[in-house]
A protein has these predicted regions:
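Mid-bilayer segments of alpha-helical transmembrane spans in multi-pass integral membrane proteins
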Residues: 95-103
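Hydrophobic residues within alpha-helical transmembrane segments
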Residues: 12, 63, 92, 137-140
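Core segments of transmembrane alpha-helices
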Residues: 59-73, 139-147
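Eukaryotic polytopic
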Residues: 128-135
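Interfacial segments of alpha-helical transmembrane regions
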Residues: 2-15, 75-96
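Juxtamembrane boundary at the C-terminal end of a transmembrane helix
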Residues: 150-157
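Interfacial loop at the N-terminal end of multi-pass membrane proteins
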Residues: 3-69, 110-128
Length: 157
């Protein structure tokens, strides 16, 4: 029972993260990633909803997903059934994705993009261009993990 609950919670967190990430990439980023200037970026972040998601959605989803991935790695590691490989691969993939997010994406967003007045214009443009180009790639491991978690859940006995 614990295995089904923890695997399902990880699947839920991946679903939320995947949905939020897709929404940001398709709807939110285009509203602030172009014509980046230190004196206007903060207003663009506010009006696009990026500031709110960075303060209200991601601080809940990302740490929960990281913690759930660790718990699921431990449970999947010790699980001997048919779901083992799918479950473990998904949990490790999500954990690595969270590590990358916490090591690069969150610090860049908080220290530079959300505080644009402190960064020189040319440098800020390069930071935003790189960040918005790399960020969508985080969705690929989440899509793969989502599929692996579904496969694991089907095979769980």
């Amino acid at each position: 029972m614990v295995t089904i609950i923890t695997l399902s919670l990880l699947l839920l967190s991946v679903s939320l993260s995947l949905g939020g990430g897709l929404y940001e990439v398709l709807i939110v980023y285009p509203n602030w990633k172009y014509n980046v200037e230190p004196h206007t970026l903060r207003a663009k972040l506010e009006s696009s909803g990026q500031m709110n998601s960075g303060k209200r959605f991601w601080p809940l989803v990302s740490p929960a997903q990281g913690l759930l991935s660790i718990i699921n790695i431990i449970l999947a590691w010790n699980y001997t059934g048919e779901a083992h490989n799918y479950w473990l691969a998904a949990a490790i993939t999500i954990f690595v994705n969270r590590l990358i997010t916490f090591a690069y994406f969150i610090p860049e967003m908080l220290r530079k993009i959300m505080q644009p007045e402190q960064v020189e214009a040319t440098r800020l443009q390069a930071i935003v261009r790189r960040w918005t180009a790399l960020s969508p790639w985080r969705l690929l491991p989440e899509i793969v993990s989502w599929g692996l978690l579904i496969a694991a859940l089907i095979r769980l006995r």
